[in-house]
C-alpha cells in the first residue's frame, strides 16, 4: 500500500477540514443538549440531541462524497467543546455563532470548488448552502424567543414544542456514508 500523500486539491483539503468541523459541531450540540437536560428543559434538549445527529450526518455526507470520488478520507478527532453555560440563552447564542461559522465555511468550500473548476464539488455544496440558511434562521429565532421569554423558560420550551420541527432530512439531501442515523 502506498503512503497517503495528502489532499489532491484545495477543495479536498477543505472538505477534510469540514468533516472535522461537522463532527466537532455534533459534539458541541451534544454538550448543549446535556446542559438543557440538566436544567430540566426537555424540549430544548430533544432539539439539540437531534441537531447533534444532524451534524454527524452532515460529516458523513462529506465522507460519502469523497468516497464516491475515489478520494481518501481521514476521520479526525474533535475539538474540545463548551459544557458550562450560565443560562439557556448563552447556549443558544453559542449555537447561533456556530451555525454562522459553518455558513462561512460552506461558502468558502463552494467558492473554492468553483475557482478550481470542480463543478461536482460546487454542485454538492449547494444543498449545504440551503441547509445553512435554514439553520441560521432557526437559531436566530430561538435566541430572539429566549430574549422575549426572559426568565420564563416555560414559554421558551412551549415555543420549541409547538414550532420547532424535528423532521427527517429534506429530500434531495446527499447520502451519508453508512446511512443516516
Curated annotation (Swiss-Prot):
Keywords: Encapsulin nanocompartment, Iron, Iron storage, Metal-binding, Oxidoreductase, Virulence. InterPro entries: Ferritin (IPR001519), Ferritin-like (IPR012347), Ferritin-like_diiron (IPR009040), Ferritin-like_SF (IPR009078), Ferritin_DPS_dom (IPR008331), Ferritin_prok (IPR041719). Fe cation 2 binds at residues 55, 99, 132. Induction: Induced by 1 mM reactive nitrogen intermediate sodium nitroprusside dihydrate (at protein level). Induced by exposure to 50 uM FeCl(3). A possible member of the dormancy regulon. Induced in response to reduced oxygen tension (hypoxia), repressed by carbon monoxide (CO). It is hoped that this regulon will give insight into the latent, or dormant phase of infection. SUPFAM superfamilies: Ferritin-like. As this protein can be easily produced at high concentrations upon expression in E.coli and is highly stable, it is a good model protein for testing new microscopes. Its EC number is 1.16.3.1. Fe cation 1 binds at residues 22, 55, 58. Its main location: other. Transmembrane segments: none annotated. One of its GO terms (biological process) is response to nitrosative stress. One of its GO terms (molecular function) is ferrous iron binding. It is found in: Encapsulin nanocompartment. It comes from the Bacteria. Belongs to the ferritin-like superfamily. Prokaryotic family. Homooligomer of 24 subunits that are packed together to form an approximately spherical molecule 12-13 nm in diameter with a central cavity, in which large amounts of iron can be stored. The C-terminus (residues 163-181) targets the protein to the encapsulin nanocompartment. Interestingly the C-terminus is localized iside the ferritin cage, in theory it does not touch the interior of the nanocompartment. Possible cargo protein of a type 1 encapsulin nanocompartment involved in protection against oxidative stress. Iron-storage protein that displays ferroxidase activity, catalyzing the oxidation of Fe(2+) ions into Fe(3+) ions, that can then be deposited as a ferric-oxide mineral core within the central cavity of the protein complex. Retains ferroxidase activity inside the encapsulin nanocompartment with a slight decrease in rate. It is not known if this protein is normally found in the encapsulin nanocompartment. This is Bacterioferritin BfrB. It comes from Mycobacterium tuberculosis (strain ATCC 25618 / H37Rv).
Amino acid at each position: 500500500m502506498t503512503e497517503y500523500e495528502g489532499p489532491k486539491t484545495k477543495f479536498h483539503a477543505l472538505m477534510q477540514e469540514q468533516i472535522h468541523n461537522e463532527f466537532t459541531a455534533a459534539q458541541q450540540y451534544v454538550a448543549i443538549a446535556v446542559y438543557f437536560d440538566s436544567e430540566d428543559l426537555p424540549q430544548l434538549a430533544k432539539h439539540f440531541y437531534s441537531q447533534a445527529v444532524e451534524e454527524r450526518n452532515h460529516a458523513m455526507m462529506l465522507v460519502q462524497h469523497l468516497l464516491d470520488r475515489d478520494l481518501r478520507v481521514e476521520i479526525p478527532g474533535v475539538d474540545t467543546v463548551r459544557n458550562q453555560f450560565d443560562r439557556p440563552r448563552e447556549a443558544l447564542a453559542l449555537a447561533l455563532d456556530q451555525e454562522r461559522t459553518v455558513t462561512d465555511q460552506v461558502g468558502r468550500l463552494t467558492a473554492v470548488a468553483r475557482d478550481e473548476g470542480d463543478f461536482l464539488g460546487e454542485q454538492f455544496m449547494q444543498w449545504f448552502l440551503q441547509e445553512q440558511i435554514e439553520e441560521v434562521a432557526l437559531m436566530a429565532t430561538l435566541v430572539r424567543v429566549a430574549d422575549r421569554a426572559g426568565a420564563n423558560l416555560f414559554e421558551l420550551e412551549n415555543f420549541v414544542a409547538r414550532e420547532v420541527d424535528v423532521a427527517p432530512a429534506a429530500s434531495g439531501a446527499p447520502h451519508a456514508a453508512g446511512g443516516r442515523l
